[in-house]
Regions:
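Amphipathic/hydrophobic helical signal segments and adjacent flexible N-terminal regions
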Residues: 1-49, 57-67, 133, 141, ...
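Short hydrophobic/aromatic-rich beta-strand segments that constitute the beta-sheet cores
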Residues: 22, 51-54, 83-87, 106-110, ...
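Sterically constrained small-residue positions within well-ordered secondary structures
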Residues: 31-33, 43, 66, 76, ...
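Hydrophobic/aromatic beta-strand elements that line small-molecule binding cavities or substrate pockets
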Residues: 37-43, 71-76, 96-100, 124-130, ...
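Short acidic-glycine loop/turn motifs at beta-strand connectors
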Residues: 45-46, 78-80, 102-103
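Secondary-structure transition/turn motif
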Residues: 55-57, 88-91, 111-115, 141-145
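Helix-adjacent hinge/juxtasegments
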Residues: 59-98
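Acidic, glycine-rich flexible loop segments
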Residues: 90-94, 100-126
């Protein structure tokens, strides 16, 4: 049974749809650099948003094989390529970001991040996603733990 047609406002981000697997690396001031494996699923329901689920597992060091992060969220598609991201993260953060898509490049900057009482403090996030030669790449910068906006993650994912 075929699903509903893609909402026209989501056409500029249709390149994200599908199941993606890949590898990434991360680091942050005061944190030991690490490598990880990632799985991300992005789908639509016919409404003006894409839904996504993302999970990562560390591939090196003492935590090799352990899940280290997870996200569930929605990429809301607006007029003129404008976007809003609403995401909940397993470490205890909820993020609302806004930005845009141009060709196959998405840039999103946080409007606000809410931390659970037991979570570490994250004050800002910037995400950049782009598709290049069939590979979905991203960079994530954040301001956390009283640090200025600093690179945190980069990954390359392939559609499976």
């Amino acid at each position: 049974m075929a699903g509903p047609p893609l909402h026209p406002l989501c056409a500029p981000v249709a390149f994200l749809l599908g199941d993606w697997h890949g590898e990434g690396r991360g680091g942050y001031p005061g944190m030991t650099p690490f490598a990880y494996r990632e799985e991300m699923r992005i789908w639509h329901t016919g409404k003006a948003y894409l839904a996504f689920e993302q999970r990562t597992w560390q591939t090196d060091g003492e935590k090799a094989g352990r899940e280290i992060h997870g996200e569930l969220g929605y990429l809301r598609c607006l007029e003129d390529g404008q976007l809003e991201l609403v995401v909940a993260m397993a470490p205890g953060h909820a993020e609302v970001s806004s930005g845009s898509v141009q060709a196959s490049r998405i840039t999103l900057e946080s409007e606000g991040v809410l931390d659970a009482p037991s979570a570490s403090r994250v004050s800002a996030v910037k995400r950049t996603w782009w598709l290049e030669d069939g590979v979905l790449r991203y960079d994530l910068e954040m301001s956390a733990r009283d640090q200025p906006m600093t690179w945190h993650l980069a990954a390359e994912l392939r559609r499976v």
